[in-house]
A protein has these predicted regions:
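C-terminal motif of bacterial Sec signal peptides marking the signal peptidase cleavage site
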Residues: 13-15
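Bacterial N-terminal signal peptides that target proteins for export
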Residues: 1-8
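Soluble non-cytosolic domains of exported or imported proteins
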Residues: 92, 111, 145-153, 190, ...
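Alpha/beta-hydrolase fold nucleophile elbow
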Residues: 167-179
Length: 306
């Protein structure tokens, strides 16, 4: 029945010309709601990521502009890369950015902001915004309204090849996205918890009765999630989807922060400095230093509870 409802909803979204739907889960995904309620407690925390290995030919290097990766089992895909000279001297963070429907990879520059982009590159890191596969359909990412793992395979190949060529900090692999990209980032946190350190979702979350599978339950990654209040609605209500996402992670023992910026379906640009501070404070496997509350200078609408 879940699969039938998902197909019907996808058709409805197309008919309505929506900019972004919610994410759809397959019938094999585990049931939602009280995910950890029957457990004796969370497992011991994972302290080291499990990194993917290259499955195809890696690019010679990662440089500014478009780079092609070749994951096994799917056609080669391009990604947009931002990287600086500092990457030759130090292994910095890798930030994946997933744009919204109708947008472009360059949205990363707006979603992160110029100061954060500069800081990431100065730390020897890079930002990678995958290019959508037209075969994904009306929405940019397979997990926005389906169950295909193609985009996750692209991310895996980027991680593996970046480690092999330019070098990255394996403890600082993060994901961020807006709308369809926020929904994808939500999925990626669960489905690639073997290496994702922490995530930020602008108008993302969970909206169907079933949850995505979690790859490594022992990686209790932290999440920073935003919604724009009651008016943050594009077919689905992102306020409700975000609150459900927050409830599930906290039930699993994760530290999750939720922010109502009150400006509808938009990226809260005033929060961008706090997004970078959040990523810096939450490497892989670490206890959140903010588990009792956020710093005084953090973006004001954010907190531990809705």
């Amino acid at each position: 029945m879940t699969r039938v409802c998902s197909v019907w909803l996808s058709l409805l979204l197309v008919a309505c010309g929506a900019a972004d739907p919610g994410a759809s889960d397959g019938a094999t995904d585990p049931p939602a709601s009280d995910a950890g309620a029957e457990d004796a407690g969370p497992p011991p925390r994972t302290t080291a990521p499990t990194l993917p290995e290259p499955t195809g030919a890696c690019p010679e290097t990662f440089a500014n502009g478009r780079v092609t990766v070749s994951p096994e089992g799917i056609a080669p895909r391009e990604v947009q890369v931002w990287i600086g000279d500092a990457a030759a001297e130090q292994d910095g963070p890798l930030i994946f950015y997933w744009h919204g429907t109708g947008s472009r990879p360059e949205e990363a520059e707006y979603g992160l902001g110029p100061d954060t982009m500069e800081a990431i590159l100065a730390a020897g890191g890079m930002v990678v915004a995958p290019i959508r596969d037209p075969e994904a359909g009306d929405f940019p990412w397979y997990l926005t309204a389906g169950t295909g793992d193609d985009d996750l395979r692209v991310a895996d190949e980027v991680v593996a090849c970046a480690m092999e060529t330019v070098g990255i900090d394996p403890m600082r692999i993060h994901s961020i996205g807006m709308s369809a990209g926020g929904l994808h980032t939500t999925q990626m946190g669960y489905r690639r918890s073997s290496y994702i350190a922490s995530v930020v979702a602008y108008s993302g979350g969970l909206y169907l009765p079933r949850l995505p599978p979690i790859e490594d339950p022992a990686n209790r990654f932290s999440a920073l999630m935003f919604h724009g209040g009651e008016s943050d609605v594009v077919i689905i209500g992102f306020e409700d989807a975000t609150e459900r996402y927050h409830a599930d992670l906290t039930a699993r023992g994760h530290v999750a922060f939720i922010c109502d910026h009150g400006s509808g379906h938009t990226i809260p640009t005033a929060a961008r400095a706090s997004v970078w501070a959040f990523f810096q404070a939450h490497p892989f496997g670490a206890e959140s230093p903010w588990s009792e509350g956020l710093p005084a200078d953090f973006y004001a609408p954010c907190g531990l509870t809705p």
